[in-house]
């Protein structure tokens, strides 16, 4: 079962918020401390009208910038509330961790599920696997050092095969002299 399609009863609002925060991390690469403190002031439009998230990381104070995917925009829209300064409802980390454990069981996942996996998923599956250069991913994640990004962004088998196919195609007519 895909985590994003997990049905959660309305009476479990706290679990719904946790699921949405985790999905937001998958679509933006934000850490928990950053996601729960993002406000409308962190959103801006580029010259083409696309909405971006621009924020200073709580952990490092480095700038993170990421263009918001439609899925992330939908999550922001779901929680639009003029009375709250943050984009998402507040949720303390202990509640989030407990809810992540419950959601893992509800989804039938055997592996532990922690919020930070969303950040790793963004780096590996959403960006690197789709051909975004690791240098760009590093800027999106707000890293000061590409070595840190390499911990997050793992090359998947799919990406490896696609890169090798491109390499073989590019070198097809190349005559190597050994």
What are these regions (language model features)?
Residues 17, 30-31, 59, 64, ...:
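Short, cationic motifs built from Arg/Lys/His that form the positively charged side of catalytic pockets
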Residues 3-32, 36, 130:
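Basic, Lys/Arg- and aromatic-enriched nucleic-acid-binding interface segment
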Residues 166-178:
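C-terminal secondary-structure termini that scaffold catalytic or DNA-interacting sites
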Residues 3-5, 28, 37-75:
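Conserved tyrosine-mediated DNA breakage-rejoining catalytic core shared by Y-recombinases
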Residues 69-110:
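Active-site/catalytic core of tyrosine-dependent DNA strand-transfer enzymes
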Residues 23, 27, 119-144, 151:
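C-terminal catalytic core of tyrosine-transesterase DNA break-rejoin enzymes
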Residues 16-21, 93-94, 110-130:
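Short basic/aromatic active-site micro-motif
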Residues 57-61, 141-166:
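Catalytic-site neighborhood detector that most strongly recognizes the C-terminal catalytic loop/helix
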């Amino acid at each position: 079962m895909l985590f994003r399609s997990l049905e959660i009863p309305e009476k479990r609002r706290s679990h719904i918020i946790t699921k949405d925060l985790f999905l937001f991390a998958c679509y933006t690469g934000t850490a928990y401390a950053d996601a729960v403190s993002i406000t409308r002031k962190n959103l801006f439009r580029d010259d083409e009208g696309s909405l971006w998230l621009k924020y200073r990381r709580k952990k490092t104070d480095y700038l993170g910038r990421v263009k918001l995917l439609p899925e992330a925009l939908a999550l922001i829209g779901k929680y639009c509330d003029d009375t709250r300064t943050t984009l998402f409802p507040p949720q303390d980390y202990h509640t989030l961790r407990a809810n992540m454990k419950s959601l893992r069981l509800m989804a039938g996942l055997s592996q532990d599920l922690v919020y930070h996996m969303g950040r790793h998923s963004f780096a590996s599956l959403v960006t690197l696997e789709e051909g975004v250069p690791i240098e760009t991913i590093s800027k999106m994640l707000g890293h000061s050092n590409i070595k840190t990004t390499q911990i997050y962004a793992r090359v998947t088998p799919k990406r490896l095969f696609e890169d090798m196919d491109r390499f073989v195609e590019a070198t097809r007519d190349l005559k190597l002299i050994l």
